């Protein structure tokens, strides 16, 4: 049985398919001594010698349960695996895996905090991130600037930013959270583009000065999970997550050995 190289490496936990495509374009992946090609088909059981950044990878399937964890990202951490500026990354505090690597389900910019999901199942990560899945991302947003019903309606209908036209699925004031001239809102999106929320508010002359992701799909950030801490999802929540994308994963119904 064959599969595309980006799917094979994604399933092994080496990043999302898009990330792997970028590495291939940059010439960082080789197969049997030759540069890999995007969309190249390989034998899933015996794909040959694969090098990533000149390091040989072990193509060994993880026979254990798929793993997903919640990480409460603090401000100041970046979502890259290796940062050339040597800043703290969200991967630094995660538990080590024996056979593969953690894949982040989307990203949060350095000044955003809150819920990040990580998994060792590249297919799950890809489906949760893909715009076609329409997975909700919920944020608590603190803004500085004048807000009114007209501006809220503009954000609901859609504004043009560098990524194109974007809109909130839901945007409502949080009246129980007020801090002087700052105002809090709950915002829900079904996509995750770079600095999207900040740019949306900037387009209506408001500044986002605090942004917290509190929910991704049906996974809510636990109130007792402190910043910089992680928590592994149990089999019940794993099943809910797979059901969210209509993805039948028989292995989650099996008991861990």
From Swiss-Prot:
GO terms for biological process: enzyme-directed rRNA pseudouridine synthesis. SMART domains: S4 (SM00363). It is an enzyme of class 5 (isomerase). One of its GO terms (molecular function) is 23S rRNA pseudouridine(2605) synthase activity. Signal peptide: none annotated. PROSITE patterns: PSI_RSU, S4. This is Ribosomal large subunit pseudouridine synthase B. It comes from Buchnera aphidicola subsp. Schizaphis graminum (strain Sg).
